[in-house]
Amino acid sequence: MPGGYGVMGDDGAMDYSVHEAWNEATNVYLVVILVSFGLFMYAKRNKRKIMRIFSLPPPAETLSEPNFYDTISKIRLRQQLEMYSISRKYDYQQPQSQADSVQLSLE
């Protein structure tokens, strides 16, 4: 290519493929910028609608949250009751073993 990188053709005429590609690229960029700007303006005006779409899962999550804490409190209550029953069993068994030990020490 004696004339350069695609600027001059074989017959000496200007090769406009670079200019056409540039024009198409700038048109695409312009369309992308305009669409982005339009979406930004739409999002700014309809912020509540968009936020309502993304905020649907949290109400279902808040319903499960009290159940989670209820189950934790029930588990804690059950543990406390088990510990109380174990301590009561130990208290009932303790005087007998003390009486036995006292009897053994007296003998």
Swiss-Prot record:
Tagged with keyword Calcium: no
The entry's keywords: Membrane, Transmembrane, Transmembrane helix
One Pfam family recorded for the sequence: UPF0697
Signal peptide bounds: none
Entry GO CC: membrane
Major location (coarse): membrane
Organism, as annotated: Bos taurus (Bovine)
Residues spanning the membrane: 20-42
Subcellular location(s) per record: Membrane
Designated name of the protein: Small integral membrane protein 19
InterPro entries: SMIM19 (IPR029368)
Family classification: Belongs to the SMIM19 family.
PANTHER family linked to this entry: SMALL INTEGRAL MEMBRANE PROTEIN 19 (PTHR31888:SF1)
Membrane topology: Single-pass membrane protein
